[in-house]
Amino acid sequence: LDGVLDVYEPSSNAAGSIDWSWKRIAGGSEVGNLAAQIAVSKVGCGYSQAMRDEEGWYDCSSLVYRCYAEAGITYLNGKTAADEAKYLVEHGMTVSASELQPGDIIFYSYESNGRYRNISHVAIYIGNDEMVHAANPSRGVVRDPFRPSNLTEPLYARPQ
């Protein structure tokens, strides 16, 4: 099944409520697809830096390393998104925007913060111009549109 990702896709039914059904998305590696699928399953979980390693709670970097750990890649255990980015860059795992596939990691730099490349946020690309990330305490883990124009210094990586 390399190159195929199953994700939940919302649609409204006749009664006006939302149905969630599986939709297949092409592209991505087997591990990347699995990490993306796991990330989608975390949508609705809470956001907390203090409880980032407890069941049902994530911050942005713990969402990435825990989804990838569940998919079989255990080296992404940095305390921050910047730590994860530095490891992936140093090990030659970056990709360009045109190469993005489900499971790839998107790193955000908003302002100078003294961390590696000023990275302060991270998300998992799930295909179809969408991503999953632990947004903040009020939103928790969410599925959002991916807008590359929001990135000041784009950095994308594909763990292997």
Region locations from a protein language model:
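Paired acidic/hydrophobic, glycine-rich loop segments that form the ligand-binding mouth/hinge
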Residues: 105-107, 124
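Short, compositionally biased
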Residues: 3-10, 117-130
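Short loop segments at secondary-structure junctions
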Residues: 111, 127-130, 160
